[in-house]
Amino acid sequence: LEDFIAKTNIDGFFLDTMSSLPDSFITIQKKFPSFEFASEGTPKEQRQIEQLTSSWDQIGDIRRNYKVEIEANMFRFVFPEHPLNMVSRWSVGSDKDSIIKRAAFNGMGLVIWQDVFGVWLPFNNKQKQQIKKLKNVFNKYHNIIFGSNSVPLIETLSNGLICNQFYNDNNQKIFAIYNFTNKSIKGPLVALEPIVKTKIQQIFGIKTNLQIKKIKKINT
């Protein structure tokens, strides 16, 4: 394998059906420190998490297996240095919308798998545009989204909202906010520290009128 890697200059291996790195591959990792080992299963033990460079967050039928469209992925926030890429191979239609929303809410990549063992299950044009926008956001704001100070499910100030906070060492933050209700919410979202110079912009999702206001001695 070492000879094959040296001759082909490949970037890494995908460990199909696996969630750990075989002991025989450890020497490869030592000889090629930047080599990628991505597993299909999310690792569960410390050794696996340390040795694998990334893994899939693979879910089945969203409608059947999950009661909510969006939820926080705690593994992603506990181990931000271990990229998780979301995939639901058999999802179709609006279920693919849910996968994109989950990836955006948790700051996670997507596995684009459309030809599933000969079954063609494509993303539609609108979904492809959303994925492209999300990729651009991840590239532009990578150091914030994968910041070590990120926190899942911070307190929100209106009922029906959940929020993940991505936060880097330069005090830059991204709030991923999801509305659980089927109605528009007009009101405070999250509390901000009383910083003199604060700039805010929306970078993804449904266009929203965002403002910074002081409400009851809390900058919101």
How should these model regions be labeled?
Residues L1-P22:
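Active-site groove signature of glycoside hydrolases
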Residues Q202-I212:
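A short, surface-exposed interaction/processing loop segment used at functional sites
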Residues P22-T198, F204:
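Active-site-proximal substrate-binding groove within the catalytic cores of carbohydrate-active enzymes
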